Amino acid sequence: MNRTVLVIAACLAALAYVWGLGGQYIPSNGDEMVYAHIARKTAESGHWLPLASDLFETRNTKPPMLFWQAMVAGDLGGWSLTALRTPGVFYTFAVAAALAWLVARSSGLTGHDAGLGLGQPSITQNAQGSGHRQASAHSPWATGLLAALVFLAFFSTLRYHRAYLTSAPETFWFSLPILVWFWQLGQRTSHHGAIFSIADNTSSSALTPSWPSVVLLGLGLGIGLAYKSFALIAPAAAAWWLVVLASQPWMGWRALMLLSLKVGLAALLALGVFGLWFVLDPDPAGVWQEFIVAENAKKFSDQRGYWAEALSLNGSSIWSQLLAYAVNAGLLAPVVLGLMVMGLQHVFKPQIRFSQRFHAMSPLVALALAWLLVWLVTFTIPSQRSARYVIPAMPAVALLIAVYWPRIHAHWFRLSALLALVGAVLLARVAWVMSELSGGLGISSSLEAVLALALAAGVALAALASLHPRACRTAALLSVLGVYVLMDAVLMPMDSAQAQFAAPDSSTSVPISTPPRVAVPNNFNGQYERYRYILPAGFQPQPYEVGARAAQGKAGLEDLLAQHDSVVWSQDVNTSKPECEPACKVLGVRWVLKSRHLAGEVRLDNLWTPQDWLFAREWWLSRAGA
């Protein structure tokens, strides 16, 4: 792995996560604005608990740590989307740095130290797919950096770690016990011994985490629970327990009992930290009903019946959950599938007994497999299954890909590069349509369009470079990260000052209420909250339903204008003026990206014309006499 290429990839990854962080359209969880609303209302209430919300039966949807984080960040950063999302990015980079450290500290990953530890040299595939034996030329730190970059290249990391409704904190806190355990193993090895060898003192206590670390890590696990849910103590503690067990060549029953006692104590401490919510909240009954019952217990119920849902072929079945890690990888899904195929081939390889495979397995690989197994098995049990639930184990997937990087067949990387190429072409088309060039919509300037097209060309070159046998792997990684940067560049004009509503002057708008009430569209739970980051300061967004449940057309607009000081109204791209004129006047206009498309709205025959389904105009309107 060329170090210069790694540095370029690291710069692309950092740029992808930082650039456009405050954007309205970055990949995120659809419920992000719901949680931003709860955080804002709680901050406005002047107290930390109970949580506050104007949304019906939507208050204690998550433990308070996520909202407290937003309250602190909002106070420091002026309640901007950038401020709310920045802590998640810090957590993400911390996980990536810790992962790089773990892999680099573990071993050089060369020859028999790599992979399954069966004494086989690394295998690199040539362009035709045949393998030739080659000792890995990766330095430990290069392999560690590679693991971090692969983790950042997963789409689940970009989407669910970067947004305010983030998975980054629990990923960090639930990974910490595993990382600290391997640090403790490294501290106990001799100067010349392998990093994972057990110290000469093989007493029960030497084979288990130290008591101080158990207490501190138990408190850390509690912080992770306070971000997401008490139920996650099951996979977090079980993964820690199994990783410690799998990292040792042998553990007697005394050590096993002591390990179970220590992990159990840490779990109790973590649950105690989470339980402080019930102690500190003035409304513990509301916490129980809204969070424990409504948010958690319902995941074990299903109207179709548990087994009917579990064995079905839809997205919530056991079969789909088995592909959760590949789904979370996004554009790198083919590489994850290639890793899985290689693992299955080794498991069923003839003439090697299972016990031999297990005892010869390197502790680093055993760590990752135990980590992945626990999270996957745990989240096949609830009736509501989703690839999102195993996101805290994605660092283990990145670890395995980095370890087996030279051995995964080159064709899997080429498939990822091909997906990145398709994504770059589509994004380039969107950038072209947005631009002033060739009669586009004029949303972006020529300079912004040229920048996006140049980045798309760079991604295309990187993807095509994957055809070279020695460059296919790094080219795939660069092309995937390049797509993320390209996405930021394409979205940049949608978040510029020119794309936002300007405050109307007194000659065009005389507010009737204080603060003036603005009716804004709400096509999903809590989405109207985003207009607090779009409208000028001092205007109060009031949601109205859009879609099948709402009044449509001119009559619906007139009703809204009669009931509010002003209205934000969305119309098709080809509409040059609002349909309420001359009974209304325009306070502002901007372009928006449409989401939650209806069935049949996006088709193969119109995929190349995004102006037909991706864009809309939003008009800020008031009554003509206002």
Where are these regions (language model features)?
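Loop-to-helix entry region of an early transmembrane alpha helix in multi-pass inner-membrane enzymes
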Residues: 64, 68, 77-97, 160-164, ...
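Transmembrane signal-anchor helices characteristic of membrane glycosylation enzymes that use polyprenol
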Residues: 2-32, 265-282
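Transmembrane-helix motifs of polytopic, lipid-linked glycan transferases
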Residues: 86-115, 119-126, 176
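Membrane-embedded architecture of ER/inner-membrane glycosylation machinery
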Residues: 215, 349-380, 384-544, 556-565, ...
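Short acidic/glycine- and proline-prone juxtamembrane loop motifs at membrane-interface regions
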Residues: 159-170, 386
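Extracytosolic helix-loop segments that constitute the early lumenal/periplasmic catalytic or substrate-binding loops
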Residues: 16-20, 34-58, 65, 72, ...
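Transmembrane-lumen/periplasm boundary regions of multi-pass, lipid-linked membrane glycan transferases
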Residues: 37-41, 159, 184, 219-223, ...
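Membrane-interface transmembrane helices that cradle and orient dolichyl/undecaprenyl
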Residues: 112-113, 118-138, 177-214, 224, ...
